[in-house]
Amino acid sequence: MTQTNPNEQSVELNRTSLYWGLLLIFVLAVLFSNYFFN
């Protein structure tokens, strides 16, 4: 049971990519709001 499960690694990778995607969407939303409200 000391061997790491490759499924856990893929889940961790998906979670990291999901956080990066949300961060990218947030930054784009801020940039677009600044562009439209100026």
UniProtKB/Swiss-Prot annotation:
Which chain regions cross the lipid bilayer? 17-37
Q: Is Plastid among the key words of this record? A: yes
Provide one Gene Ontology cellular component: photosystem II reaction center
Location in or out of the cell: Plastid, Chloroplast thylakoid membrane
Its GO biological process annotations read: photosynthesis
**UniProt KW keywords:** Chloroplast, Membrane, Photosynthesis, Photosystem II, Plastid, Reaction center, Thylakoid, Transmembrane, Transmembrane helix
- Membrane topology label: Single-pass membrane protein
What is its biological role?
One of the components of the core complex of photosystem II (PSII). PSII is a light-driven water:plastoquinone oxidoreductase that uses light energy to abstract electrons from H(2)O, generating O(2) and a proton gradient subsequently used for ATP formation. It consists of a core antenna complex that captures photons, and an electron transfer chain that converts photonic excitation into a charge separation. This subunit is found at the monomer-monomer interface and is required for correct PSII assembly and/or dimerization.
Q: Which family does it belong to?
A: Belongs to the PsbL family.
Q: How does it assemble?
A: PSII is composed of 1 copy each of membrane proteins PsbA, PsbB, PsbC, PsbD, PsbE, PsbF, PsbH, PsbI, PsbJ, PsbK, PsbL, PsbM, PsbT, PsbX, PsbY, PsbZ, Psb30/Ycf12, at least 3 peripheral proteins of the oxygen-evolving complex and a large number of cofactors. It forms dimeric complexes.
Do you know which HAMAP family this protein is assigned to? PSII_PsbL
Report what the protein is called.
Photosystem II reaction center protein L
Q: Which gene encodes it?
A: psbL
